[in-house]
Regions:
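Amphipathic alpha-helical segments in well-structured domains
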Residues: 11-15, 48, 149-150
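C-terminal auxiliary extensions adjacent to catalytic cores
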Residues: 191-238
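A conserved FAD-binding loop/helix module that cradles the flavin
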Residues: 135-177, 181-183, 192
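Cofactor-binding loop segments of dinucleotide-utilizing enzymes, especially the Rossmann-like FAD-
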Residues: 1, 36-38, 134
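A Rossmann-like FAD-binding core segment of flavoenzymes
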Residues: 19-115
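Glycine-rich dinucleotide-binding loop and its adjacent helix/turn
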Residues: 1-25
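FAD-site-proximal beta/loop scaffold in flavoenzymes
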Residues: 84-150, 162
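FAD-binding beta-loop-beta segment adjacent to the flavin cofactor pocket
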Residues: 112-130, 183-204
Length: 238
């Protein structure tokens, strides 16, 4: 779907891994990525280079392809200028904050997202209600990633403790994001960024020169990706 949506590189990673499987086991099959966006929205150069060099005959990317309707019976996706029938459709619909947020009247931006005070992640319309992760209207250049949501939670928890104990809320929080994506079963890439609260603009802004993307896909990044995944799962779920 058109950005913003959850896990910006997710659809491209998924397509890459399906193409990797097809190349090994079903060489007559093909992946067609129909993207509502004008271009790849995350790790563009790394993904497009992988597709060109690894899956030139296996994966086709079509930008500006906004889905309007799905016929599940015929496995057909209807787009503005064409209908596409496939053996398997993997549809990712437009996204918004969940029904609990909608029912509570917390969605205030574009009928999709919840606006918050970024120092506390408190709702702009419901005092003492704190919202984080994919549900919020993100700050500039802030991805809707699980790693970022984990950082949101830490800032929010720290703020809630301060508010409950009568202490001052941290007025200069810093968030970090790291995301790895596999482009084959043994090759991966990453993107990283740092976001600092700007008191004047009352939002988080990306720190220039902090973070970046992989120089190239490689097996070392694939090993790092697995370690990164285990660490974020442990930090979030245990």
């Amino acid at each position: 779907p058109k950005a913003p949506y959850r896990c910006p590189p997710g659809p491209y990673e998924r397509a890459s891994l399906v193409a990797s499987y097809f190349k090994r086991s079903k060489p007559k099959s093909k992946v067609i990525v129909l993207d509502a966006n004008a271009e790849v929205v995350s790790k563009k150069g790394l993904f497009t280079k992988a597709w060109e060099e690894l899956y030139k005959d296996t994966l086709e990317y079509r930008p500006n392809s906004e889905l309007t309707e799905v016929n599940a019976a015929t496995r057909t996706g209807k787009f503005q200028f064409e209908d596409v029938q496939a053996g398997v459709l993997n549809v990712i619909p437009p996204q918004r904050a969940g029904s609990i947020a909608a029912n509570a009247g917390l969605i205030t931006a574009n009928k999709r997202w919840c606006e918050v005070d970024f120092l506390t992640f408190e709702s702009r319309v419901a005092p003492n209600v704190h919202i984080l992760g994919d549900a919020i209207l993100a700050a500039p250049a802030m991805p809707k990633s699980a790693f970022m949501a984990n950082n949101h939670a830490k800032v929010a928890a720290d703020a809630v403790i301060a508010l409950l104990t009568g202490k001052s809320v941290n007025d200069h929080p810093i968030l970090a994001n790291t995301c790895y994506s596999y482009v084959s079963d043994r090759l991966a890439i990453h993107v990283a960024s740092v976001h600092k609260f700007d008191a004047e603009k009352k939002t988080f802004l990306a720190v220039p020169g902090a973070g970046g993307v992989s120089a190239a896909r490689n097996e070392v990044e694939a090993d790092y990706a697995w370690g990164w995944a285990k660490n974020i799962w442990a930090d979030t779920l245990r």
